């Protein structure tokens, strides 16, 4: 299942209303871990999740994970900083509990990527 605007890659995603229903039901069942990514449905997955969580639950009651990749700067420090800022804005929060690289980047030195993730 994926939340977000259906695009050319994933036409099976849930729209905002359906996403909200699923997220609220998950919260009602006690689910508190949500995973998304900067590239899921062109960022709308993060937007939908962020709006529902903001209206439904205190931020410290959920664990939010997001992932980074699929961007022009790959996994450079500059790209990671830009992408996490975008994810935080779309999610409507000032922190993530877990930030993951979506795929390994063979073109950026691993030291640069790891140092950026450790900020």
Predicted features and spans:
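N-terminal binding-site loop/beta-alpha segment at the start of enzyme catalytic domains
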Residues: 1-62
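Active-site beta-loop-alpha junctions enriched in small/polar residues
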Residues: 1, 37-39, 67-71, 101-104
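Glycine/proline-rich, positively charged
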Residues: 71-119
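P-loop/Walker A phosphate-binding loop and immediately adjacent motor/lid segment at beta-alpha junctions
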Residues: 57, 68, 117
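Structural preference for beta-strand elements that scaffold enzyme active sites
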Residues: 32-33, 61-67, 95-98
């Amino acid at each position: 299942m994926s939340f977000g605007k259906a695009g050319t890659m994933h036409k099976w995603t849930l729209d905002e209303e359906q996403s909200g229903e699923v997220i609220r039901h998950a919260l009602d069942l006690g689910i508190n871990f949500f995973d998304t990514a900067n590239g899921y449905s062109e960022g709308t997955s993060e937007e939908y999740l962020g709006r529902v969580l903001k209206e439904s639950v205190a931020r410290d009651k959920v664990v939010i994970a997001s992932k980074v990749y699929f961007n022009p700067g790959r996994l450079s420090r500059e790209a990671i900083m830009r992408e996490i800022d975008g994810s935080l804005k779309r999610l409507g929060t000032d922190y993530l509990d877990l930030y993951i690289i979506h795929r390994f980047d063979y073109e950026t030195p691993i030291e640069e990527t790891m140092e950026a993730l450790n900020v």
